[in-house]
């Protein structure tokens, strides 16, 4: 069953690349054509890479791994927070803290400090602190929530990163590379594919494109959680037990995965037709490019 259809990718503008003057020559193999001064990404390749990414994320989470969702640009912040929270994965949608991966021990201390401050009674008089002291601590807590709130349950370095805009998140990419952590990312036409182990050629600037692809990665994580929760087959080593907060999340992702599966069944005919005739897909993509109102990324 298809993870996503060609129509969904077209409707979300995943095929729109940057202007031809802003590109990375290494991305040439992922480009279908040029139209109105901008590149059009080959969605046939995007579909193939999406399937590979989906399988990797599902298996990683099923075996006890964690996917860190990273996207600090405005177009990605909401989708990153919503989808990561939906499947109980950590996320960073504000400023990336230097050393978050390479100096995780220090970050863990800041997380412990945040949880310590959360225990204080800021409204009552039982804390033993003056109003001024409480105000200072409240401001400290708010700052920690903003920068670390998305990784509060991260107890060790993640198994992989999902990144929106590899150029903007170059610090996260560099730290992951130093530690040998696989990177899954959207590759726009100005990106360097050599930095990413699991690329998805696509538009990393449009909100709809970012939301769709992030939702797909979250669905894969949800399916992995469900598999981890199921009884392992005889002779297969059991995965790490689910934490309580993960168990609470299982019901919602399971329902959403089922609903998504039912929706995809109805669209499988369109996908089969698109794959059977690549020329028709190209024509459809160019027609959609004229019809879509969204302006290509600059």
From Swiss-Prot:
It comes from the Bacteria. Keywords: Ribonucleoprotein, Ribosomal protein. One of its GO terms (molecular function) is structural constituent of ribosome. SUPFAM superfamilies: Ribosomal protein S2. HAMAP family: Ribosomal_uS2_B. Belongs to the universal ribosomal protein uS2 family. This is Small ribosomal subunit protein uS2. The gene is rpsB.
């Amino acid at each position: 069953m298809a993870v996503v259809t060609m129509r969904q990718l077209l409707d979300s503008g995943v095929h729109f690349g940057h202007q031809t003057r802003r590109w990375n020559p290494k991305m040439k193999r992922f480009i279908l054509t040029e139209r109105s001064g901008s590149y059009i990404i080959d969605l046939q390749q995007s579909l193939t890479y999406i399937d590979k990414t989906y399988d990797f994320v599902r298996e990683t989470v099923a075996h006890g791994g964690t996917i860190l969702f990273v996207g600090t640009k405005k177009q990605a912040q909401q989708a990153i927070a919503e989808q990561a929270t939906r499947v109980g994965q950590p996320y960073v949608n504000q400023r990336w803290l230097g050393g978050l991966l390479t100096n995780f021990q220090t970050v863990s201390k800041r997380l412990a400090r945040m949880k310590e401050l959360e225990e204080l009674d800021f409204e009552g008089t039982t804390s033993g602190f003056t109003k001024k002291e409480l105000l200072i601590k409240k401001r400290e807590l708010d700052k920690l929530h903003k920068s670390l709130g998305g990784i509060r349950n991260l107890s060790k370095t993640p198994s992989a990163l999902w990144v929106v805009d590899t150029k903007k998140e170059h610090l996260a990419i560099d730290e992951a590379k130093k530690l040998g952590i696989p990177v899954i990312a959207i590759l726009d036409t100005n990106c360097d594919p050599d930095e990413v182990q699991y690329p998805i050629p696509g538009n990393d600037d449009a909100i709809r494109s970012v939301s769709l692809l992030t939702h797909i990665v979250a669905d894969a994580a949800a399916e992995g959680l469900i598999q981890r929760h199921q009884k392992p087959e005889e002779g297969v080593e059991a995965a790490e037990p689910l934490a309580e907060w993960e168990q609470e999340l299982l019901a919602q992702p399971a329902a959403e995965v089922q609903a998504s599966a039912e929706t995809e069944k109805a669209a499988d005919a369109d996908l089969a037709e698109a794959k059977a005739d690549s020329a028709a897909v190209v024509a459809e993509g160019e027609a959609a490019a004229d019809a879509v109102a969204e302006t290509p990324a600059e």
